[in-house]
UniProtKB/Swiss-Prot annotation:
EC number, as in UniProt: 3.1.3.-
Enzyme class: hydrolase
Required co-factors: Mg(2+); Mn(2+)
Protein name: D-alpha-glycerophosphatase
Known pathway: Polyol metabolism; glycerol biosynthesis
Signal peptide: none
Subunit structure: Monomer.
Compartmental location: Cytoplasm
Keyword Manganese tagged: yes
Length: 20
């Protein structure tokens, strides 16, 4: 199953990361 999580980058922006 593929899950997704929202993590903050070093510059402070929010990016959507996909992980298995």
């Amino acid at each position: 199953m593929k899950k997704c999580a929202f993590v903050s980058d070093f510059d402070g922006t929010i990016s959507k990361q996909d992980f298995y």
